[in-house]
UniProtKB/Swiss-Prot annotation:
Compositional bias of kind Basic and acidic residues: 241-250, 353-369
Composition skew (Basic residues), residue ranges: 257-266, 395-404
UniProt-recorded name of the protein: Gene 68 protein
Pfam families recorded: US2
Family as reported in the entry's similarity comment: Belongs to the herpesviridae US2 family.
Ranges where the record places region Disordered: 230-304, 353-418
Protein source organism: Equine herpesvirus 1 (strain Ab4p)
Length: 418
């Protein structure tokens, strides 16, 4: 089944920008977010896979309790980096063999969607800065959930996402709720809506303490492909700004769309329909008066007479087939025989075309073509009402029977015709 949901856990500054690397953020804030991620990973939305930056090893003690296969890491600063001192804080990385290593989040995402592992639904959690989260928004399609802590400071080096956190997508502030409902949001009216709540109440032993530098914790659902807000359940769809592709005056846009639809109907009027109850034959086209056009369908005259309809207006269809038979007589032999049968059909008689009739007509055609080539007079055709006589072959042709059946063979034996 693969990855069914992606949740990004990160930090943003007052400009809604992400830090370039994990070392640009205080370690206590990463510890707070890692515990938030550990709490949320218990929701029943698939097998949790929490991937983080390798330099957050010291601040991810709560995530180390997960199975080794569920807590991979990505070494964003290279394979040789082990520790980095920043403002007196040492950011240690995982030692070799402590955790499963991915080359990137994209490679791990493709691995979870491949057939190399068990086919199960996976919920991918991404904990880190822009060096880890940026490929998730740029290279992995589809909407994603975001959980980020907003601080009042400003990062020296940052990355501004194209969807601008908190501006183009609706955000929901997180508050603490009862410990038996860790993933629900307490609405203003007293009703609970399942959208994603984090934290425990003061009665819980694992209460989470928010760092003083954090203004608020935000939950949002973003889709960089659409670049518009996705409202929470029960909330109306917000109006888009002109910079986002919306209209400054929605009433004027609605009036213009109505005017275009009215003018379009006047300019492109629908063609008049046939009489009520008239059914269009399958695969056929109708003329202005409702009759099938030439070449559209080949109606059955017996069916028309059985329904009380006159077959005479449809004789033009057989006339057209007659001209086609003159151009390609071998392919349209059955149409020519059907044209010969018209007089008997109109009299109420029913005559079926047989294999002998088709074969006799082919032999007559071969003899006529040969006489035209030799300059000999053509033989007269028999009337269509009676049974046509078998054609007489010229003196230079003889009838022979071989393994392939009846054949026309020259006496010299140089040429054969099937």
């Amino acid at each position: 089944m693969g990855v069914v949901l992606i949740t990004v856990v990160t930090v943003v500054d007052r400009h809604k920008a992400l830090p370039n690397s994990s070392i640009d953020v205080d370690g206590h804030l990463w510890e707070f977010l890692s515990r938030q991620c550990f709490v949320l990973a218990s929701e029943p939305l698939g097998i949790p896979i929490v991937v983080r930056s390798a330099d957050l090893y010291r601040f991810s003690s709560s995530l180390l309790t997960l199975p080794k296969a569920c807590r991979p890491i990505v070494r964003t600063r290279g394979a040789t980096a082990i520790a980095l001192d920043r403002n007196g804080v040492v950011y240690h990385e995982d030692r070799m063999g402590v955790s499963i290593e991915w080359l990137s989040v994209l490679s791990g995402y493709n691995h979870l969607n491949s057939s190399l592992i068990i086919n199960q639904p996976y919920h991918l959690w991404v904990l880190g800065a822009a060096d880890l989260c940026k490929p998730v928004f740029d290279l992995i399609p589809g909407p994603k959930r975001m959980v980020y802590a907003e601080i009042a400071d400003e990062f020296h080096k940052s990355w501004q996402p194209p969807f601008v956190c908190g501006k183009l997508f609706e955000t929901i502030p997180w508050t603490t709720v009862e410990h038996n409902h860790p993933l629900k949001l307490r609405a203003a009216g007293g009703e609970d809506t399942v959208v994603g709540e984090c934290g425990f109440s003061k009665h819980s032993s694992n209460s989470l303490v928010r760092p003083p530098t954090v203004k608020r914790v935000i939950y949002a659902v973003v889709d960089p492909a659409r670049l518009r807000e996705i409202p929470a359940p029960g909330r109306p769809l917000p109006r888009r700004r002109p910079s986002e592709g919306g209209d400054a005056r929605p009433e004027a846009a609605l009036a213009r769309s109505r005017a275009r639809s009215v003018h379009g109907r006047r300019r492109d009027a629908a063609p008049p329909r046939g009489p009520a109850g008239a059914r269009r034959p399958p695969g056929g086209r109708r003329d202005v008066d409702g009759t099938p056009t030439l070449g559209s369908v080949r109606p059955d005259i017996h069916t028309l007479k059985g329904r009380g309809l006159s077959p005479v207006p449809h004789l033009a269809l057989w006339v057209e087939q007659w001209f086609l038979a003159l151009q390609k007589p071998r392919l349209y032999t059955h149409h020519r025989l059907a044209l010969h049968n018209i007089p008997s059909i109109l009299k109420g008689e029913k005559r079926e075309d047989t294999f002998e009739d088709n074969r006799r007509d082919e032999l007559r055609h071969d003899d006529s073509r040969h006489r035209r080539h030799r300059g000999l007079p053509l033989r007269a055709r028999s009337p269509p009402q009676c049974q046509p006589a078998p054609p007489r072959l010229g003196p230079h042709l003889r009838r022979s029977r071989g393994r392939g059946g009846r054949q026309l063979q020259r006496r010299g034996g140089a040429e054969r015709r099937a």
